[in-house]
Each structure stands twice: as structure tokens, then as C-alpha cells.
Amino acid sequence: MAEVEAGAALELRGLPPEIPDELITLYFENHRRSGGGLLLSWQRLGCGGVLIFQDPADAKRVLAQAEHRLHGVRLSLRPAPPRAPERVLLQHLPPGTSPLSLEQHVQALLGAAGHPVQTCHALASPRQDCALVQLSTPLSEAEVSALAEQARNLPLNGATVSLAWVPQTRAVRVVDSASPVDLLLLELYLENERRSGGGPLEGLRSLPGQLGTVISFQQWQVAERVLKQKHWLQGIELSLVPHYDVLEPEALAEGVSGRDHSATQESGVIGHAPTGTGGLAGALTMAVGSGEAPQQLGTLLRAGPVGAPGQALPVDSGSIRIQGSMGSTSPVDPVESSTELPEQVGPMASDSVGVQEQEGLGEVATGQEGLMGLVGTAMESVETGLESPGYGEMQKQEGLVEMVMSVEPGAVRYLQLYYEDLLASLEDVALFPLEGTDVTGFRLCGARAPCQAAQELLQSLLGSISCHTLNMKHPGSARFLLGVEGQHLLHRLEAQFQCVFGTEHLASATLDIDPERTDPTEALQVLHGHITGIDQESLRLEDVRELLATLESPHGGEDRVPLEMEKEKPGGPGETVVEQQEEIPTLEAEEEPVALSTGARGQLEEEATLQLAIHRSLESQSQVADQQEANALRRAMALSLLEAEEALDEDTGGEAQLVVHTSFEQDVDELNQALSNALEAHLREETVSLQGRMLPPELGARLERCHDVSATLRGDRVVLRGFGVQPARAARHLAALLVDPWDQNLTFPLEASKPNLSEQGLKEPLGRLEALEENSQEFQDVVRAFYSTLDAVHGRIRIVRVERVSHPLLQQQYQLHRERLMQSCQQRPVEQVLYHGTSESAVLDICAHGFNRSFCGRNGTLYGQGVYFAKRASLSVLDRYSPPNAEGYKAVFVAQVLTGDYGQGSRGLKAPPLRVSGQVLRYDSAVDCLQQPRIFVIFHDTQALPTHLITCKNILPGTP
């Protein structure tokens, strides 16, 4: 369908199998009956299919028509997803066809159609005579048509098999699950875009006979996105495959498609309706029993003060369904699931059990006595697998339901703060706030009618709340606002402007470091000793000058006026002469000394400087060498810290964002200005003198990102502004970086966005290559390890040469990074020898600057936007990763890589994945698979050290 005009394809659902294809085409080509027009094609898929109109306007009219009926059956239509180019459907398979036979048959069809043989995979199917085959290379619509023609001519085990294209799927199916997956937990997980890549669901149902669980999404893009990721839930890896109704057994498919999608479902069926307004994701309705009368539910809202003893909420198994904000539902098959409902709906107080011992109740903010907060989320409650001891008694009761409304965290707090009395007045409904990282909102328990009325009331209240995003212009605002002082500031503004601030978006703008750890820049304070040494040099120059003046005085040292005393006298040289005249009667006797103390001062200064220079030239040269080495080490450490602590500008584009919920009447500009003024009052400044040296722009930019400060150049000084201790830390860091002058002709070592290597670019200190002798032990070790990981391509790769990569500065930074990981990392080993294939043009850059992300990572971003390394060289020698040059030579680096603790990688990552949901601590690297990782992705430039460069080439067939 890539050639089909946009909007011309419609998806047809609810089609009984007895309606022939000819009737379908005639009906939708009849302009008077259906509003349609000429059809290009009709692709039938089970109890539905895809209509492709020649004119998109015809498809638009068909959609606009209120109803379509054939043989008394109401048909459902909606825009169709585009064709899936890497997927084909095979139907009319003979019984007992194995997946291997099916894959071999598809490969035979590809060969017969003139296509190169490619890897294909037959996916698990609930129906034996239909199967879906996933291809490794996409096919065009014309190529699929040619393949379908070959399928009619080439039988499979004596049976004629039909082949057809399928659209992108809207549904996925969970198969091969080792243990049953909790359906409510699965639903919440797949609705969470951050956790699973999913989104709003259209329905969720279990197929009979352990054929799998079908999850339908409202958007096909979401389903396809979910299929591209790996999924883990409760320690179990989920196996997800595309799902179409045509793959289901005929009786089941007819039952699903034949129902009226607008009808109310029976108890025990789960489905989804479109998302409502006001930030609601829908309401979950559960028909359950209860041990108390509905009138007693209101007592939950009037429970005792904060911290009063509570009672854990047990879990019960019951019938589940999803109800939209307008009450519409979608029918699907019965399933079983679990959720929470209080065993006893009454006062939550308990004399014998304290609130600290209860797993499900917690404290709420001051002034929220009417609302009992839940610790964790609905997902956490389900994961605990609690069982209700009162289940049998509850089954005797009828008419009570439970609803879960998904609401943004800021909106929940706003309702709790400013509508407390109104919420507490709901007599017949128990209202529980859900405040967690995955699900936030309200749980309503009670009779159906009061719960629906309470739901409508909450929707109305949510409609009166406006949500705005405020951008923080000051560096370090996110870190400050998440601290104690920042929280106090936000609370004061909330009380002043009747609003609620949400800090959930601030965590991504802060550094992924532990804020409680020791300041790493304290080690750089050795610079103070260097400054003291300069002062001592100045004092020694004064001593030499005094000694020379004393030796040249005709009256000796006792009559000589010290130079310091002359400077301290208020008068000029004239006053000095008058005092000497009063003490000594003979003026002529004093004229010569006076002339010596004034006219010869410049000569005396020159002699003192010369004598000091002669003296210093006689000192040991080792002291100078030691000082230079210490300065180099100090600056190398500062550079390493600058890279290791670089701020991760992910999700917010490097700018912190604060979410605010308030009423529509509130002036948001006034609120934003008040917040900006309050932040200005907490800013601190530090000044660092450049001492006549230049500050490279790249250095200043990295320093700002590293310490969350702003650096402004004012004459010969740099003014650092930020919050808390950050300006002081940045000042220490900058002082260490300015120990020696920067060579302005060299690119900044950590900034290689525009690499510019001259002829001496591979000389020290940037890096150099040194060829290894083939008979050396080092050469043999590198070659042996390389060949042992080539796997199937072992006999097709020949090594041309091996070179050692030397880069002292990068090695120092790497060692510092390694020592830091050795102390904090739990995974062992921390360090691994990996391979990195690259192009010829990138070799010089890597040798000079290491594995910098600005010119690495161009070949793939499937597991993150970092630098990729392979555990086995067989992956690195592929032409995709190490393209050969004009002479056929390929470049593969051997590298020591600090993989540390690694997490699951995913597309779009600009930093390692978070360790724990809701915290800012991250893993050290990302991998393709947690169980057996083959690919590692790093995000710090000092995390990998190139040790050897292997130049190799492919051996052509027949080459000796």
C-alpha cells in the first residue's frame, strides 16, 4: 500500500463469513448505497479486511455515512493502517505444517519469484491453517503480488496455499508465557508509554486453550512500537507477536466480530473505550461484592487525622471491564484478573495495628485528613499478589463496583488541596488517591450509581484546572528545586497563588549522580599550594633586594632605612631628606646616600632580579619537572571530572521544566515572574581570575553543563553563577583547568564535534599509532583473541596489520573513571575487552580524541544514541559497521570498555537507562539483551580506551 494515495484505504470489521466478496465490492462501489466509488482492491482478512478506493474522497464519504449494514449486520469502518512490508499471511495450510516447513516454503517462493533468499520466521498462530511469516527484508506491493502468484503455482505438501499482504497491526498477542500474567498488571504496563512504549488500549482479552492474550491498541503506531521492544514483567520476559483476527479459530473470530461494539459488556469481560477529557485515561469498573453497606463507604473520606492506624487492602479476583468516561464499552471475551478492594469498608482505624505496619496505606499532606493516600500504585498492589481472606463473604454481596480514574499527579494534588471539603462530602463513595510512578489518579469504591456520579463530578473539577509548563532559565534550577530549600520555595508560592507545582519533569534535567556523595573537586584544591609557591617567590625577591641595598650603603646595615619603611611614610622623597637633615648637621655628608636610595632604585631592582635568576638556575631541575608533572596530572584529573560529570540534557533539551496546575483565572505570567524572582534571590556568585590566559569556548560550555552554573566573561575574570555549592565547585574546577596555558591551535581534548587534525595530529599528547611486529607476543595475543570471536566468518577475514594506540591523557582519564566504577559498581567484571568497527575517515578522530559520540554511533541507534561495542568481532567486521575503503581494507578497534552495571537499551536513549523508576541514578551502560549481551552502548567519552587498531580485509572466494 505504499503506492496507495493517503486516506484511500479503509479497514472493515464485523463482517460475517457468509457474505461473499463480490457483494462487498458491489456495495462499496455503489455511490448511492454506501457513498463510495471505484475500488482498486479488496483484501479479505478473516471477519474483516481492507478496502482501497481509487479516490480518497470516496473513502471519506464512506466514513462519514452514519451506518453501513449488509444482510442486517452492522459493519464497522475506520482508516486502515499502511501495509506491513515485512509481513505476509499464508492461509489454507495443510494440517500438521511445522514452522520450519513453512519457512522453507516461503524461501522457495522467494527463489521462484527471482528474489534473493532471506531469513524468515514463522510466528506462533492460534489457528492451524493460517500463519504469519516475518521477513527480514521488506517487499513492495508488486513483489508481494508476484509472491502470491508463485504460491498458487507451488503447492505445500500437496495443498495450494494462498499468500496475502497484511496491514500494520493494531493488536499484539502474548504467547509462550511460562506462568500466567496478571491481566490488570499487563494492562497497566502496556498503557505506560515510558515503561513499555505502549499507549491507550482498545481492549484486552484472553484466547481459550492457552492460545495467548490479545491486547488491542487505539493506534496502530503504538502496537508496532511495542513489538520492536523487549518486555519484562515480574521477572518474566514477555513474548509478543503481531495479531490479526484472521489468525483466531473461526468460531472465536465470529463471536468477537459479530458483537455490537457499542453494547454494554457482560460481567467478566475486559475492554476499552476512547479516552475521556480532563486528563482521564478511562475508568476501570469491577463488579464485586462487599462486606458492608454502601452507606458506610463515606466513612473512609472522614477517617482520622494524618497517620491514624489503617488497614491493609486485600486483593480479590473478580470480573473486570473497562468503562470509558462516557460509559461506552467494547465487548471482548471473558478473562479473569485481580484488583484491590477493601475487605471491610468502614472506619480505617485499628487499635492493634499501626500505620507503619500496614502495606497499602500511608500519610498524606497536612490538611488532607479526609483523603487517605496509598503508598505505591495500583501496579504495586497487584504485584504483591495479596489474597482476600473475606472473599467468600464478599461474593454474597451484589451491586458494588470499583473504578480507577487515571489523572496527572499535579491534578490529583490540586484536588486534594483545594477541593478537600467537596470530595469529603461524597457520602456513599470511598475515594482513594493513587500516587505512584506508573499510575496516578483516584480509586472509587461503592454502588454503581454513586460511583458514576462521583466520576462525573471529578471530570467536571478536572475540566476547571489548567496545566502549564514553565521553563527554568537558570542553570541548576532543577537540582535546586528538588532540594529542601527549593521545596520550601515552591510551597510558599503554592500558598500565595493557589496552585500546585509538579516536579516529575525535573529529574531528567538533573545529573545522574548521587547528590550526597563527596565533592569530587575537593581533590583539585592542591592548586592552593601552587599559588603559595608564587607568593614565596615574591618574598625571596624582596630578600635579595634588601641584601643588595644593605651591601651598597656606606653606613652599613644599621643606618640604612628599609625600603618597606620608605614606602610606608606618608610623605615623598622630600620629607625623607628633611628628617635626615635634622638628625645629621652636615648636609653634604647625607647627599650621597640620598642619591643612592632614589636614583639607583631601578638599577637595584634589576640587580636583585638578576641575582635571583642566577640562584634559581643553580637549583635542581628535578623540582621543575616535578612541578610540571603535578600540573599536568592536576589538569588531566580536572578534564576527567569534566567529562565524567557532564550533565545529561535528556528529554527537556537541556532546560528544566516545571509543571504547574492552577485555575483558569490565575495569571500564569505573574506566577512565572514571581518564581523567577524567587530563584534569583537564591543565586550565588564566584569569581575566578584568568591570570592573562584565554578561556576556550568549549571549556566554558562544558564547565557550565558539568556544574549547572552560568559562566560569564568580565574582562580578565570569569563570573560563575548558580545555586548552593555549585559555583564554588565550578570555581575550584576552573582554577585547576587553568594551571597551564591552553594551546589555542589544538582542539579542546573533550570536544571533537569539528575535529581538525594537522600533520602532527597523531603525535603526543593527542595520540599515536605504533605498528606491532608479527613475531611479538603482543601481536599474537591480539590476533588470537580477534580470530577466536570471528565465528562463521573466521575463514573469510585476513589481518593486514595490527597497531598499538597510545594516548596518555585519555589513558589517565580512563583510569580515573575505572577507579570510580570499581568503588560503586556491583556488576563484575567492570571492564571488558570489546570491538568497534568503524570507517577509515573516523580512525584518526578516534586515535586523537577517543570514542567521542560526535563522530561515533552513526551506524545505529537501536539501543541508544551512544558509542556501540561488540562482544564478538564477527559483528564488527560486517561491512555495515566497518565499511572497506577503496583498497578493501577494514578498520576494527580493540578497546577496553568500562561496561559496569548495565541496563536494557532502547531507541532514543541519550544516557544510560535509569536504575530505579523515579530516581535519577542511572546504569553505567546499555545492552541489547540483559541475559546474554552481545552489544554494549556507552555514553561517556572516557568510558572506553582504544588499545589496538586491526586493519583487515575480506578474503574473496578462490583467493589462496
From Swiss-Prot:
GO MF assignments: DNA-binding transcription factor binding; K63-linked polyubiquitin modification-dependent protein binding; NAD+ poly-ADP-ribosyltransferase activity; NAD+-protein mono-ADP-ribosyltransferase activity; NAD+-protein-aspartate ADP-ribosyltransferase activity; NAD+-protein-glutamate ADP-ribosyltransferase activity; NAD+-protein-lysine ADP-ribosyltransferase activity; nucleotidyltransferase activity
Subcellular location: Cytoplasm; Nucleus
Keywords, sorted A to Z: ADP-ribosylation, Cytoplasm, DNA damage, DNA repair, Glycosyltransferase, NAD, Nucleotidyltransferase, Nucleus, Phosphoprotein, Transferase
Catalytic activity, EC: 2.4.2.-
Region (Disordered): 325-346, 553-576
Extent of motif PIP-box: 780-787
Keyword Metal-binding: no
Residue numbers spanned by region Myc binding: 649-856
GO biological process: chromatin organization; negative regulation of fibroblast proliferation; negative regulation of gene expression; negative regulation of protein K63-linked ubiquitination; protein auto-ADP-ribosylation; protein poly-ADP-ribosylation; translesion synthesis
Compositional bias (Polar residues): 325-341
Domain of life: Eukaryota
The keyword Disulfide bond belongs to this UniProt entry's keyword annotation: no
Boundaries of every PARP catalytic domain copy: 755-960
GO cellular component, one term: Golgi apparatus
Residues modified to Phosphoserine: S381, S388, S617
InterPro entries for the chain: Mono-ARTD/PARP, Nucleotide-bd_a/b_plait_sf, PAR10_RRM1_2, Poly(ADP-ribose)pol_cat_dom
Record's catalysed reaction(s): L-lysyl-[protein] + NAD(+) = N(6)-(ADP-D-ribosyl)-L-lysyl-[protein] + nicotinamide + H(+); L-aspartyl-[protein] + NAD(+) = 4-O-(ADP-D-ribosyl)-L-aspartyl-[protein] + nicotinamide; L-glutamyl-[protein] + NAD(+) = 5-O-(ADP-D-ribosyl)-L-glutamyl-[protein] + nicotinamide
Motif Ubiquitin-interacting: positions: 604-621
A UniProt-annotated Pfam family: RRM_PARP14_3
Extent of Basic and acidic residues compositional bias: 555-570
Gene3D superfamilies xrefs: 3.30.70.330, 3.90.228.10
Task performed by this protein: ADP-ribosyltransferase that mediates mono-ADP-ribosylation of glutamate and aspartate residues on target proteins. In contrast to PARP1 and PARP2, it is not able to mediate poly-ADP-ribosylation. Catalyzes mono-ADP-ribosylation of GSK3B, leading to negatively regulate GSK3B kinase activity. Involved in translesion DNA synthesis in response to DNA damage via its interaction with PCNA.
PANTHER family referenced in this protein's UniProt entry, alphabetically: PARP/ZINC FINGER CCCH TYPE DOMAIN CONTAINING PROTEIN (PTHR14453), PROTEIN MONO-ADP-RIBOSYLTRANSFERASE PARP10 (PTHR14453:SF94)
Domain notes: The PIP-box mediates the interaction with PCNA.
Oligomeric and partner information: Interacts with MYC. Interacts with PARP14. Interacts (via-PIP box and ubiquitin-interacting motifs) with PCNA.
Protein name: Protein mono-ADP-ribosyltransferase PARP10
